[in-house]
């Protein structure tokens, strides 16, 4: 069997390392850009939903949210109907860096797909979606623990 996950892992680590260098100039620590983007795209999301969206455990989410809140990129607000629920929103500072993060992501995406036709790029995307869907059940079971 072809070990595709090793390749996916190497690609992920390389792109993550590059992103961390780029985002250091806007005071985002390792991997925090992803949280800012997802919260920006899903205003009012709760931590559990963010955990499922990003595919990281709740403890990691809690640490990241705490750091991002401390650094002024996001804020937690109580749900108007249930004060125990804390909803996440980007602050003005978070909104200001969002376009920069997206530009960097688009650049990385175009570099990664250099030499691919539009059809090939779509095929890669479709295959990766299928792979993610295959592991979603395992993730849901793991995350429920």
Predicted segments — roles?
Residues 66-129:
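Charged, amphipathic alpha-helical coiled-coil/dimerization segments
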Residues 47-48, 59, 66, 86:
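Residues within helix-turn-helix
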Residues 14, 18, 34-37, 96, ...:
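Pre-recognition alpha-helix immediately N-terminal to the DNA-recognition helix
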Residues 31-33, 59:
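Key DNA-contact positions within bacterial/archaeal DNA-binding proteins
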Residues 1-26:
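N-terminal leader segment of winged-helix/HTH proteins
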Residues 42-46:
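Short capping segments at the starts of secondary-structure elements
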Residues 9, 37-41, 102:
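Short, locally clustered residues in the helix-turn-helix/winged-helix DNA-binding domain
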Residues 51:
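The alpha-helix within a helix-turn-helix
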């Amino acid at each position: 069997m072809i070990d595709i996950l090793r390749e996916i892992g190497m690609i992920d680590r390389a792109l993550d390392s590059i992103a961390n260098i780029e985002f250091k100039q806007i005071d985002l620590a390792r991997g925090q850009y992803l949280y800012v983007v997802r919260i920006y795209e899903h205003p009012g999301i709760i931590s559990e939903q963010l955990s499922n969206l990003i595919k990281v455990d709740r403890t990691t989410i809690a640490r990241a949210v705490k750091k991002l809140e401390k650094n002024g990129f996001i804020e937690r607000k109580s749900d108007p109907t249930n004060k125990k629920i804390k909803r996440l929103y980007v602050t003005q500072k978070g909104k200001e860096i969002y376009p920069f993060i997206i530009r960097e992501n688009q650049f990385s995406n175009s570099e990664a797909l250099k030499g691919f036709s539009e059809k090939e790029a779509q095929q890669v995307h479709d295959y990766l979606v299928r792979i993610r869907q295959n592991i979603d059940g395992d993730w849901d079971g793991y995350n429920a623990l």
